[in-house]
Design a protein with these regions (language model features):
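A contiguous binding-surface segment within folded domains or other stable secondary-structure elements
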Residues: 52-91
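Hot-dog-fold acyl-thioester-processing enzymes
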Residues: 13-65, 121-143
Length: 143
């Protein structure tokens, strides 16, 4: 993703723009033994935000995380820093939705991590995938 004019949008190769709606402040409880943001805490934030984004898109909270692609931590955050989590839909399957995610530090817009694929699957009461019958919506329309 490339930062566009230092704004709150990232542009990927298909000319889509990613918006950042979720922010978290790094607190003492979020730090590792090195004094920086614990990777596990960040992954929990990402999974939670992806769940919220997905349920808004599919209009159904009966989703499970199926897959998260490779994660590389490119930079870190420290106590008091604000991190922003951006999501966008990259694919919509019959029972699934695939998202891309960028996490950056507010103010510097330095990327902490980016994830190319987070896949959620809509499931029925039996735990089996079920069709969602939804089309991609922009986040403004979904929330």
């Amino acid at each position: 993703f490339d930062l566009i004019n230092n704004r709150n949008f990232y542009k990927n190769g298909s000319d889509k723009f990613m918006k950042f709606y979720s922010r978290k402040m790094v607190a003492a409880k979020d730090l590792n033994s090195n004094g920086s943001l614990f990777g596990g805490r960040l992954l929990a934030w990402i999974d939670e935000e992806a769940f919220i984004f997905t349920t808004c898109q599919l209009k159904d909270p009966s989703v499970v995380t199926r897959y998260i692609s490779n994660i590389e931590f490119l930079s870190t955050a420290r106590i008091g820093d604000i991190v922003e989590i951006g999501m966008e839909v990259v694919d919509m399957g019959r029972t699934s939705i695939t998202l891309a995610c960028v996490v950056r530090k507010k103010g510097t817009e330095k990327i902490i991590t980016q994830i190319d694929k987070i896949v959620f699957v809509l499931v029925g009461h039996d735990g089996q995938p079920k069709p969602h019958y939804q089309k991609v919506k922009f986040i403004d329309e979904a929330i």
